[in-house]
């Protein structure tokens, strides 16, 4: 669930709607955006993350996905340090609420202003730096990490450490015409989705496989038909993964 869906009504009312729907909330998106050149900016980010944790707890979401943030012109190493400091500051709140914080590595094309954490290795390094706390995990989105030559190894590392909490599916279209909202339906692009799904399953992941397609192109179509296409393409990915075992 995205946080903007909680706007415009009391949080308790949103929580009741979720419970009555019978749906399981996998996570709340999003927290993060910890880096800043101004301490006041970083402080506001901490407040917002604490609010996200409160919201997640209220609606029964087990986790908050972190888009960790970056600042154009600020060295990535500095931003990564501020990310670790920010997570450490709000982690006690998350643990107290029974909510896990999930670091989501983003594709390097977002390293300018969305996230200085761009690989599974970097996400694991943050977890290690903070002492591998129980309240911290990692979300793997194939759109962001499919290109990484270390991907299979780092999936195994992440899973062994008990950090592989989320798995997001979509595809990478060629050419990509929008850096944010041109994701493909599974099978429309070049990501080896069956192979990646098999890797996370072999590593021990047993959670939801979440389809996450940001696409102006698909949003402009009949959404019932889009949903049918999602189901069919998802089943094809699963069949490919199972056939390769």
Predicted regions and their residues:
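Acidic-and-aromatic substrate-binding clefts and catalytic sites of carbohydrate-active enzymes
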Residues: 1-13, 33-40, 71-74, 109-114, ...
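A cross-domain feature marking catalytic cores of carbohydrate-active enzymes
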Residues: 1-4, 27-32, 66-68, 103-105, ...
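Acidic (Asp/Glu)-rich catalytic clusters
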Residues: 8-28, 51-60, 91-97, 128-133, ...
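Active-site acidic/histidine proton-transfer and metal-coordination neighborhood
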Residues: 20, 35, 39-137, 147, ...
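Histidine-acidic metal/acid-base catalytic patches
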Residues: 60-61, 117-140, 144-245
